[in-house]
């Protein structure tokens, strides 16, 4: 038997979280392209200002300079790489279907600054194969363990008004790296687009440093975590509608050492905890979970609705938890 635990909280307290403050830049208009590329199974065809800012090797496109690059077409084994340290790059996905067999479909190199813009009204698909996993294929030196790989120190924004479907047959759907002294600050921001992720092996979205899911429509099916960040995970922002997130299947839904839900319409079906403030690699850390807005429907089949290994604060929003009526499964565990 399930029990329904509703928590209705008025936004009476002001948060001191900078994560929820400020306004979101919703500008995702399609950019004018410097170069247009068409992927085929036999190669990449360039049109526009050719021979500047990029390299083509068979079905591998490498971006080496700032600019706006539009990619379309279809390829059964190809990839896009943004070279280490390259900033001011906009990749426009304009009806692209791209599979990469043994590495990431898109790799953003260390210390790069990249906007991946999904063009208005287009449907795009990125995928990999089981070989893109160096745990299972240690001989594969090119494995990146994600369909979209954002390396340490990279700043990546995934946005636009189109639709992107990611199928992660190797390991993760999207993987974002860490902030380091050598490579700089790392972050991943998701905004506006329609994003579908099927991750039957591991996490749908996995970040090491800072992950902002500001807006858009996300549908996620994951074997492990749906949306995970080792440190700070922000969902929505104060004064905005926030994202619509539908997690149809996962082990844990939203997980971060500092987990902030500021706005959004979120449904989570999890075999363990729906929301979890934790990181097993951090032994001395002030874990926090703060809910200041949005609507959350949590369906934990074998865990807690909300599980914080530190403070749990609810100052606003609507929270509904459906949980088994057992001692091990609590609506709130803090």
Feature locations, PLM:
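A composition-driven surface/loop motif
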Residues: 6-15, 20-334
């Amino acid at each position: 038997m399930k029990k329904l635990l509703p928590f209705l909280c008025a936004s009476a307290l002001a948060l001191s979280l900078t994560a929820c403050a400020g306004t979101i830049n919703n500008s995702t208009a399609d950019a004018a392209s410097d170069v247009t590329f068409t992927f085929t199974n036999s190669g990449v065809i360039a049109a526009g200002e050719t021979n500047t800012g990029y390299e083509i090797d068979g079905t591998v496109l490498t971006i080496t300079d700032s600019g706006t690059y539009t990619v379309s077409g279809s390829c059964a084994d190809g990839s896009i790489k943004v070279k280490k340290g390259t900033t001011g790059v906009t990749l426009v996905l304009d009806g692209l279907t791209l599979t990469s067999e043994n590495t990431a479909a898109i790799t953003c190199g260390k210390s790069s600054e990249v906007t991946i813009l999904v063009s208005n009204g287009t449907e795009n698909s990125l995928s990999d194969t089981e070989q893109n996993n160096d745990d299972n294929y240690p001989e594969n030196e090119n494995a990146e363990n994600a369909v979209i790989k954002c390396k340490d120190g990279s700043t990546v924004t995934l946005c636009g008004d189109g639709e992107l479907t990611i199928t992660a047959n190797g390991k993760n759907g999207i993987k974002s790296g860490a902030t380091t002294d050598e490579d700089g600050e790392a972050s991943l921001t998701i905004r506006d687009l329609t994003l579908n992720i099927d991750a039957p092996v591991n996490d749908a979205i996995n970040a090491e440093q800072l992950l902002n899911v500001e807006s858009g429509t996300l549908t996620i099916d994951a074997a492990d975590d749906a949306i995970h960040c080792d440190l700070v995970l922000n969902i929505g922002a104060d004064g905005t509608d926030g994202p619509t997130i539908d997690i149809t299947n996962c082990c844990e839904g939203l997980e971060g050492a500092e987990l902030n839900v500021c706005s959004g319409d979120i449904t989570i079906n999890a075999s363990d905890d729906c929301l979890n403030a934790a990181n097993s690699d951090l032994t001395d850390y002030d874990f926090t979970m703060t809910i200041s807005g949005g609507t959350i429907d949590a369906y934990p089949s074998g865990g807690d609705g909300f599980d914080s290994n530190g403070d749990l604060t609810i100052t606003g929003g609507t929270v509904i938890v459906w949980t088994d009526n057992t001692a091990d499964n609590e609506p709130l565990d803090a």
